[in-house]
Amino acid sequence: MKKFLFSLFLILFVQSSFGEILEVYTWKPFPGRSEQLLQTFQEAAAIHSKLGIGVTINALGVGTSQNMDYVLRYDDLESYGRLKDANFYDEEWNTFLAKARANPSGELVSSWSANNIDPLNMADDFTEEGQVIAFFRWQPAPGAVGLQTMIQGASESKPIHESLGARIETYQINSGENRGQVL
């Protein structure tokens, strides 16, 4: 039992410390302003990309009111800190942010962050133009055993989906809405 708990702790520590980091911001466009929100996202993405931050824009089509996700990706904790600082002090970003805040086209409805279970995955793996991305959130049973069982199940199903041509990544939400869920 001690070996199992130590292994579980080690797995959770490694994934939280070294894996790719996502920040997901879900926005709801104001009525009639979906196009403007998308244009705002594209302008923000151009600035973030210049700074070296991976960006994905997802229109949520099921169960939402035209909500959109703006996703920032970082390779690891070091690049997260370095790029967040660069973004904070970037003149182009701050000018853009002031303009977007003066005439918003939507409202932020949620935000959260997650770590990739695979510490070797890099943020730029998701920056290919035209990629189709889908997220599925799973709530593990309470406790460390529930989380480990969920991660094991995701790992076991991965080869099945990949044999059908899909690319599968598993993340654990570590802050914000639905903390502890697995993607």
Language model regions located:
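Basic side chains
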Residues: 2-3, 101
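Sec-dependent N-terminal signal peptides
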Residues: 3-16
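Short S/T/G/P-rich N-terminal loop/turn motif that feeds into the first structured element of a domain
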Residues: 18-183
